């Protein structure tokens, strides 16, 4: 039945006790439904909630399907909710807040749940686009923090304490440095300024505080070197992930320089150019070490026409890509509005990287919609780490996201907040069997890195990261299949993280929450 009203349209379909293959009918999809993967008997929201915890939605998709052989993609940008038998066990109702019905309906003649899922996902991809095949480095551990804003000391407690124990025992005191700063911090005279390369600005320096020091040990380069010194397999580095950071200090605290027509003055553009050169110096250094460089997006991708914008925060993404940037993290500061805004944003970033560098980008985003999968991976947002709940709810989240048509997924290692040595180590262990791993540093009670807590934690984390590196041919083959590319293995279109029923479709228990919520197949042959 179809009920089209002034403010909502509801499609009602029969819910069957069994599917065509004699097993219970089960429902999947809906995008990143945190903590859930099978929705039978439940209600899910198709809305950009921008909430990152269990039961909430961080990247919705108006697409669902059933093991009974059909799927529905609503062609809409409007919020909705899908009731898979929670209110009435005999029917499924799919509602969107609009006064029309526009949908794609997919059908499958598959003989089991795995074939049905592959068929319906293939139909979904034909309409919305195949999932992006990330560059290989995107499946290694990445590091994200701000290195162009705060003040540091290794002798004076000026703020947050960060202790690194490295290869020493966890009982040892380690080495502690101290950071003063945070969101939109402005450094003052006479302090040690963090930088990308251990060098200060040279253009538009009128408002740079006096007597600042620029030591390499407080630079992004030094942190990159730490990963390598501790022999940690490592793929990409974002040196500007933090509000008020930027990637150079030329034009520090300078404002103005905008004409009546919105154009920038030569001095304003010179500061941007000098900061891009600073970024290129870092990107070249990272590339020599085999590490890709990326950027976090807080502001426009072009120098804006707002005279109040500090010059050191201005962006020129095309110039950044020419400087070597191939990773882009589009945070809520830029794409938080979701829906078509998110899709347009990630497409713009994708097109710029592919046009200028002629390479596949690593775009990390959230608050997406149907179609986002052809441009970006999904990260699940900002969660508190340091507890088992963080790991628990991410396992079904990853399974459900993968069943929803976006196989490229990741989250912060041990969350962005909090932190605990045991939880962090367990996170490095299990996510070595997952697509993306993000060391989101600078926000928690501990530094975020696999060498932070000392042995045995450092050694165990290293071992699993090396295991992932050794398995990269297997992982990348599965990434090809997940991108809907035929690898000759009979798994075209199946995600990297596979719900148990995708590999064991004859087992009814594999379709259920009880049977598959906390385990999955990592490709065809590895049980996690």
Kindly label every feature range from the protein language model:
Residues 1-19, 23-28, 32, 40, ...:
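Aromatic- and carboxylate-enriched substrate-binding clefts and catalytic-loop regions
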Residues 53-57, 114, 152-307:
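Aromatic- and glycine-enriched glycan-recognition loops and surfaces
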Residues 1-202, 206-207, 211, 224-225:
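Catalytic and substrate-binding clefts that recognize carbohydrates or anionic sugar/phosphate headgroups
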């Amino acid at each position: 039945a179809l009920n089209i009203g002034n403010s909502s349209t509801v499609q009602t379909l029969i819910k069957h006790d069994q599917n065509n293959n004699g097993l219970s009918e089960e429902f999947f999809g809906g995008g990143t439904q945190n903590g859930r993967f099978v929705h039978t008997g439940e209600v899910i929201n198709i809305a950009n909630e921008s909430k990152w915890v269990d039961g909430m939605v961080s990247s919705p998709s108006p697409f669902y399907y059933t093991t009974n052989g059909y799927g529905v993609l609503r062609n809409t940008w409007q919020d909705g909710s899908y009731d898979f038998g929670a209110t009435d066990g005999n029917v499924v109702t799919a509602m969107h807040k609009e006064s029309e019905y526009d949908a794609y309906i997919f059908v499958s003649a598959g003989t089991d749940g795995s074939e049905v899922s592959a068929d319906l996902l293939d139909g979904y991809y034909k309409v919305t686009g195949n999932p992006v095949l990330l560059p290989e480095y995107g499946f290694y551990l990445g590091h994200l923090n701000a290195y162009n804003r705060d003040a540091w000391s290794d002798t004076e407690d000026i703020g947050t304490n960060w202790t690194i124990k490295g290869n020493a025992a966890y009982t040892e005191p380690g080495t502690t440095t101290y950071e003063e700063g945070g969101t939109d911090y402005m450094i003052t005279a006479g302090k040690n300024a963090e930088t990308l390369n251990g060098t200060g600005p040279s253009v538009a320096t009128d408002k740079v505080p006096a007597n600042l020091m620029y030591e390499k040990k407080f630079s992004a380069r030094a942190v990159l070197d730490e990963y390598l010194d501790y022999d940690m397999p490592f793929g990409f580095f974002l040196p500007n992930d933090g509000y008020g950071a930027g990637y150079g200090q030329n034009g520090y605290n300078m404002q103005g320089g905008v004409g009546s027509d919105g154009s920038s003055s030569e001095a304003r553009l010179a500061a941007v150019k000098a900061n891009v050169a600073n970024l290129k110096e870092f990107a070249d250094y990272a590339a020599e070490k085999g590490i890709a460089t990326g950027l976090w997006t807080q502001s426009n991708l072009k120098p804006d026409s707002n005279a109040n914008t500090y010059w050191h925060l201005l962006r020129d993404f095309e110039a950044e890509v020419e400087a070597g940037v191939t990773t882009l993290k589009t945070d809520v500061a830029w794409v938080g509005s979701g829906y078509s805004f998110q899709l347009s944003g990630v497409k713009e970033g994708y097109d710029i990287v592919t046009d200028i560098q002629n390479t596949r980008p690593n775009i990390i985003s959230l608050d997406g919609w149907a179609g986002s999968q052809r441009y970006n991976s999904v990260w699940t947002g900002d969660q508190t780490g340091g507890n088992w709940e963080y790991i628990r709810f991410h396992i079904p989240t990853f399974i459900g996201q993968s069943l929803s048509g976006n196989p490229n997924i990741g989250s912060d290692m041990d969350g962005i907040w909090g932190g605990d040595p045991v939880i962090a180590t367990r996170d490095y262990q299990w996510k070595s069997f997952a697509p993306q791993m993000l060391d989101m540093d600078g926000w928690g009670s501990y530094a975020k890195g696999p060498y932070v807590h000392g042995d045995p934690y450092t050694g165990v984390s290293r071992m699993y990261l090396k295991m992932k590196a050794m398995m990269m041919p297997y992982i990348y083959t599965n990434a090809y299949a997940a991108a809907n590319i035929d690898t000759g293995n009979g798994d075209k279109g199946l995600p990297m993280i596979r719900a148990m029923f995708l590999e064991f479709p004859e087992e009814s228990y594999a379709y259920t929450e009880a049977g598959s919520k906390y385990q999955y197949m990592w490709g065809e042959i590895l049980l996690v």
